UniProtKB/Swiss-Prot annotation:
Subunit (UniProt): Homotetramer.
UniProt-recorded Gene Ontology molecular function terms: carbohydrate derivative binding; D-sedoheptulose 7-phosphate isomerase activity; zinc ion binding
Known pathway: Carbohydrate biosynthesis; D-glycero-D-manno-heptose 7-phosphate biosynthesis; D-glycero-alpha-D-manno-heptose 7-phosphate and D-glycero-beta-D-manno-heptose 7-phosphate from sedoheptulose 7-phosphate: step 1/1
Residues reported in the UniProt entry to bind substrate: N49, G50, G51, E62, N91, D92, S117, T118, S119, S122, Q172
Protein localization: Cytoplasm
Domain SIS, first and last residues per copy: 34-196
Residues reported to bind Zn(2+): H58, E62, Q172, H180
Cofactor details (free text): Binds 1 zinc ion per subunit.
Keywords: Carbohydrate metabolism, Cytoplasm, Isomerase, Metal-binding, Zinc
Protein name: Phosphoheptose isomerase
Record InterPro entries: GmhA/DiaA (IPR035461), Phosphoheptose_Isoase (IPR004515), SIS_dom (IPR001347), SIS_dom_sf (IPR046348), SIS_GmhA/DiaA_subfam (IPR050099)
Length: 197
């Protein structure tokens, strides 16, 4: 068991090293898109399932509250939080529509959808992306493996942050790090700090 635990740490470290080579440009581009979205008076909607829903909530909390510096709240909504809305849509229509219907109501041109799925094949996240595109929103996707069906929906205006791994747990670990990098870039671009302070 101890060896298995050590192997998990080693795999996680190696995946992060691989990601540190593969992802900085896409993370930086996504952060810049988010900064421009927020400067334009728009908001960021986020969605995912399971651990990815938790990541969507984590991202939203960092923007609404703060990441590492004191600053005003920034507009972000995790679409996985309203259980009454989610269960009503799932019951009356289908689980695949729990995010898309919210986006049709809340999404505006210029908003960003942060779509999170380790496989890139989550049906409700794909429907969310389709709804976002119909609302003239931009998409930042956090995926892994081969990017799944989500990769095929992205245009040159969108950004995919695809973790170079096929292991769900390792992908989730890098997703959290990527979210922290996004938050850090957003904060430091919108609210520059004296690095020596």
């Amino acid at each position: 068991m101890l060896e298995r635990i050590k192997d998990s740490f080693t795999e996680s470290i190696q995946t992060k090293i691989d990601a540190s080579e593969a992802l900085p440009e896409s993370i930086a581009k996504a952060a810049e898109m988010m900064v421009q979205c927020l400067l334009g008076g728009n908001k960021i909607l986020a969605c995912g399932n399971g651990g990815s829903a938790g990541d969507a909530q984590h991202f939203s909390a960092e923007l609404l509250n703060r990441y590492e510096i004191e600053r005003p709240p920034l507009p972000a909504i995790a679409l996985s939080c309203d259980t009454s809305t989610i269960t009503a849509i799932a019951n009356d229509y289908s689980y695949d529509e729990i995010y898309s219907k919210q986006i049709m109501a809340l999404g505006q041109p210029g908003d960003i959808l942060l779509a999170i799925s380790t496989s890139g094949n989550s049906g409700n996240v794909i429907k969310a992306m389709e709804a976002a595109l119909s609302r003239d929103m931009t998409i930042v996707s956090l995926t892994g493996k081969d990017g799944g069906a989500m990769a095929g929906l992205l245009s040159v205006n969108d950004v995919e942050i695809r973790v170079p791994s096929n292991v769900t747990a390792r992908i989730q670990e890098v997703h959290l790090l990527a979210i922290h990098c996004l938050c850090d870039n957003i904060d430091r671009t919108l609210f520059p700090q004296d690095e020596q302070a």
